[in-house]
């Protein structure tokens, strides 16, 4: 590739120009926003709720903390954080306005709206000052980012010294036979489910493919370290179908 040629990345299994990926991802989540939470329950059999509980257990929210939840549109992580720490605050940042609309609806139906802020923004260029937040979370979102190292660098920038990053993302199973079975379910069932429930097979085909393009647990941990985080650790969930990664701005 010459300096004048456009840089390329992946969109699921497709190769696309870097400049086009964000728009393609935005299109996916704009289309699925209204059915996003329902599909999470159906695709995982509700297990995503257990994973998010494990995330909160490890994150240990405290009153007075300010959380930035990136790619958090419908507010699932934000609401869980505030349930654990009623005296905390959460800013939810998402590039897709229609996802934020769904989150605001949920907030207005509850009692947490005054502790929540909703901001449209890009994980690779966050619209916040340095050292603004105590905690940064991103749940099932970082694999959709065009340049993951840029998003991790931004996470570190906006965290205060002593702040903590936590990522919940699909990952790789260490047992080949289990991975094979999981792949069969993912490729044969989830897109069909997306068509039936959300009338959108293609978006869920992309989501399945994007999981396979995301790095394994140790490779991603190395990326977090290279972004400048310390005390980096990871934990498998459901035998590696998903994983939690934690790092600190020291």
From Swiss-Prot:
It catalyses: a 2-demethylmenaquinol + S-adenosyl-L-methionine = a menaquinol + S-adenosyl-L-homocysteine + H(+); a 2-methoxy-6-(all-trans-polyprenyl)benzene-1,4-diol + S-adenosyl-L-methionine = a 5-methoxy-2-methyl-3-(all-trans-polyprenyl)benzene-1,4-diol + S-adenosyl-L-homocysteine + H(+). The gene is ubiE. CDD domains: AdoMet_MTases. Pathway: Quinol/quinone metabolism; menaquinone biosynthesis; menaquinol from 1,4-dihydroxy-2-naphthoate: step 2/2; Cofactor biosynthesis; ubiquinone biosynthesis. The lineage of its organism: Bacteria, Pseudomonadati, Pseudomonadota, Alphaproteobacteria, Rhodobacterales. One of its GO terms (biological process) is menaquinone biosynthetic process. InterPro entries: SAM-dependent_MTases_sf, UbiE/COQ5_MeTrFase, UbiE/COQ5_MeTrFase_CS. This is Ubiquinone/menaquinone biosynthesis C-methyltransferase UbiE. The keyword DNA-binding does not apply. S-adenosyl-L-methionine binds at residues 74, 94, 122-123, 139. It comes from Paracoccus denitrificans (strain Pd 1222). It comes from the Bacteria. Pfam families: Ubie_methyltran. Methyltransferase required for the conversion of demethylmenaquinol (DMKH2) to menaquinol (MKH2) and the conversion of 2-polyprenyl-6-methoxy-1,4-benzoquinol (DDMQH2) to 2-polyprenyl-3-methyl-6-methoxy-1,4-benzoquinol (DMQH2). Keywords: Menaquinone biosynthesis, Methyltransferase, S-adenosyl-L-methionine, Transferase, Ubiquinone biosynthesis. It is an enzyme of class 2 (transferase). Its EC number is 2.1.1.163, 2.1.1.201. The keyword Ubl conjugation does not apply. Belongs to the class I-like SAM-binding methyltransferase superfamily. MenG/UbiE family. One of its GO terms (molecular function) is 2-methoxy-6-polyprenyl-1,4-benzoquinol methyltransferase activity.
């Amino acid at each position: 590739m010459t300096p004048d040629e456009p840089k390329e990345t992946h969109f699921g299994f497709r190769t696309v120009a870097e400049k086009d990926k964000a728009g393609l991802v935005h299109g996916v989540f704009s289309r699925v926003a209204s059915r996003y939470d329902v599909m999470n329950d159906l695709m995982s059999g509700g297990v995503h709720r257990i994973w998010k509980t494990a995330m909160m257990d490890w994150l240990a929210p405290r009153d007075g903390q300010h959380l930035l939840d990136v790619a958090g549109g419908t507010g699932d992580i934000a609401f869980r954080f505030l349930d654990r720490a009623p005296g905390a605050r959460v800013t939810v940042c998402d590039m897709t306005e229609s996802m934020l609309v769904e989150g605001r609806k949920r907030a207005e139906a509850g009692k947490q709206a005054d502790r929540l802020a909703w901001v449209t923004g890009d994980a690779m260029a966050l619209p916040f000052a340095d050292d603004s937040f105590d905690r940064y979370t991103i749940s099932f979102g970082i694999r959709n980012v065009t340049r993951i190292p840029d998003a991790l660098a931004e996470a570190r920038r906006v965290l205060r010294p002593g702040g903590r990053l936590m990522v919940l993302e699909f990952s790789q199973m260490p047992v080949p036979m289990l991975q094979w079975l999981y792949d069969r379910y993912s490729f044969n069932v989830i897109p069909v489910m997306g068509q039936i429930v959300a009338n959108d097979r293609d978006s869920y085909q992309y989501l399945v493919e994007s999981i396979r393009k995301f790095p394994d647990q140790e490779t991603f941990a190395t990326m977090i370290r290279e972004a400048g985080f310390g005390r980096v650790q990871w934990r498998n969930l459901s035998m590696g179908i998903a994983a939690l990664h934690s790092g600190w701005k020291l």
